[in-house]
Amino acid sequence: MPFLQIFLLSIGVAADAFACSVVRGTAIRVNLFKRALVLAGIFGVFQAAMPLIGWVIGRFFAGITFIAEIDHWIAFALLGVVGAKMIWDAFQPEDDETIVDDGRVQFRPAIILGLATSIDALAVGMGLAFVEVSILKVALSMGLITFALSLVGAWIGHHGGGKFGKWATILGGIILIGIGANIVYEHLSA
């Protein structure tokens, strides 16, 4: 998989974490840098680990002969479904919750969000098990880009940018669908 595709894939799966970081950033009143680092670190670790787990699961099924004949469609379906769900979720109403900021790092919500936003990375990892790719490069890229975008997202949210999260999620969904379509196109044109 070329570097540009890995980069775009990483941005696509990082969009949910970015959006959550923007939302969480709007609630941070004190200790922004420390809390943004923790949030970004948790998101980055989950986004790096989940595609590895998904890839292992996918490789288990890739050895089955009939699956090898439709693997490109499986990758497209997984990426397409995840991308479509991201776009759908961006248009759903958000829960209004009152957040009291006491200045402490809140690990439990960050871990729950990290897990929730990395489910798409698990599905992407499963899809990538059916194509020729260095999963370690992909996982590292996903983790680092998610970390960086989550830091930026928390900063944007802290400084009043709550509207960016929705559009980042939509863009991420479009990117994932595009990559899935490209996998099918490359297979059919080979």
UniProtKB/Swiss-Prot annotation:
Recorded GO MF terms: manganese ion transmembrane transporter activity
InterPro entries: Mntp/YtaF, Put_MntP
Topological category with respect to the lipid bilayer: Multi-pass membrane protein
Subcellular location: Cell membrane
Alphabetical keyword list: Cell membrane, Ion transport, Manganese, Membrane, Transmembrane, Transmembrane helix, Transport
Transmembrane feature ranges: 3-23, 37-57, 72-88, 111-131, 138-158, 164-184
UniProt key word Transport: yes
Keyword field contains Cell membrane: yes
An example Gene Ontology CC term for this record: plasma membrane
Role played: Probably functions as a manganese efflux pump.
Family to which the UniProt record says this protein belongs: Belongs to the MntP (TC 9.B.29) family.
Protein name, as recorded: Putative manganese efflux pump MntP
Lineage: Bacteria, Bacillati, Actinomycetota, Actinomycetes, Mycobacteriales
